[in-house]
Amino acid sequence: MFNLPSIKPNFITRDVEAPLSLSERVIYWTIILTPIWWLMGIQPLFYPAVMIGLLSVHFSLDKLIEKPFPIAVWAWLAMSIAMLWTAALGINDMGFNLQVALAATVTFMKSYFMIFACLALPFFARVRVEVITRATAWMTAGFLVTIAIQVAMLFLKIGGGGYTPLLASLLPGDKGSLRVIFAAFSKFLGVPFVRTVLYTPDPPILGICAVLCFLICLSETNKPLRKFALAGAFAALLASSSRSALLCLPLALLMGLCFESGLFRQLSLWLMSVTFIGCSILGLTFKELLAKPMEGFDQVREKAADSSGERALVVQRTLEAWQESPWIGWGVIRGKAHLYEDVYIGLGSFSTYSAVLYLNGIFGFITLISAMVLTLFAVYLPAIRGDNLCKWAFCGLIALYLACNATPLSWMAANLWFFFAWLGAVMFAALPDRVDVSSWEQFSAQK
């Protein structure tokens, strides 16, 4: 029952008909059964547990020596350690608090360390790209069904503001990311439109999730399934009403076309030249140029301007607090930004980059940027040599990094776990086959 239909990928010729490995079965069905985990309210904890558990089961020092991690994978491990270290310092500085310590541990497990586990797993267990692609395609095609059901519930006035699942209600702390929320009407481009977060806790997360699903499903080999999956991804993108995601998708597709035409090697130079010439002609700074598309959305979407202003205020207060402890940050969230009346929001709630500066300081920020850049280059080099999967992985990473400017990666990562699992399989498949030492015993004998 666990065997998928025959998949004949273009980039692998060996073992394509082999039965699924344990890791492939677990990942495949975990992705397929996403609606169940969503209704149970266990997604943010379940996905990290699955990937970290698989890595723990399959970890082998001999395999690590036989095919060591690329430096990009080590960089994500370094980022997770930096996060844990600064959090420990912060908790120690403020006085030990069990609830704060548990929250920091959970955040560590479901963010950067989970990303590391996703990228590292293919080095210890067989995780084929086409298996994750097929599962993601089925999940994304299912978006159409889920959105249709939520629209019907909206018109029938069923569900209301959603609910907190029983399992989620038993856990301590904030239940925001565990709540099941259904669709509601919201004006978008001046027209009442159905808006939903689907299986995620926040519309921008659904937006970037839809973009990444779209890019992954472009390599699905089953044409009918690919068409439904792409339609589902686009429907989810529209339902999210995420301004940044709506800009990210065409940008990602444009970059993919540049790879196809061989222009990408020269694109950065030409793009920079045209951008700054355009800025000088229009009398804009580069920052103002980037803000213009968002202003257009703000003028036509209800409450968008207020939302952007609140985000800017929180980021400003976050950076002001960071300056009091610039090198290692505060470790844990200790302050809130006052929005209006009795409404406050925790510092670091918007923008990955300001949040990392605030929590992990310059040390953590440099580590994060290094991990991002190294991961980008890990897929860029095979992409310019014609690797189609690495091309879309590169485009997906660019879209994700842009989305990180509005939403913390530590908040998004658990809902994007399938992308990181796919990315790890893509990076592993793109590595050259070189084996110098095959076991720890051989390594010890060479000393």
PLM feature spans:
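A juxtamembrane structural motif centered on a specific transmembrane helix
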Residues: 1-27, 61-67, 420-447
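Loop-to-helix entry and N-terminal half of a specific, functionally important transmembrane alpha helix
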Residues: 23-36, 377-408, 425
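A membrane-periplasm/extracellular boundary helix in multi-pass inner-membrane enzymes
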Residues: 84-87, 148-158, 257-302, 323
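N-terminal hydrophobic segments of proteins, predominantly signal-anchor/transmembrane helices
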Residues: 27-37, 52-124, 145, 398-404
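Transmembrane alpha-helices of multi-pass inner-membrane enzymes
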Residues: 51-59, 393-403, 408-447
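Long extracytoplasmic/lumenal interhelical loops at the membrane interface
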Residues: 288-360, 379-386
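Alpha-helical transmembrane segments of multi-pass inner-membrane proteins
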Residues: 36, 133-160, 172-241, 246-258
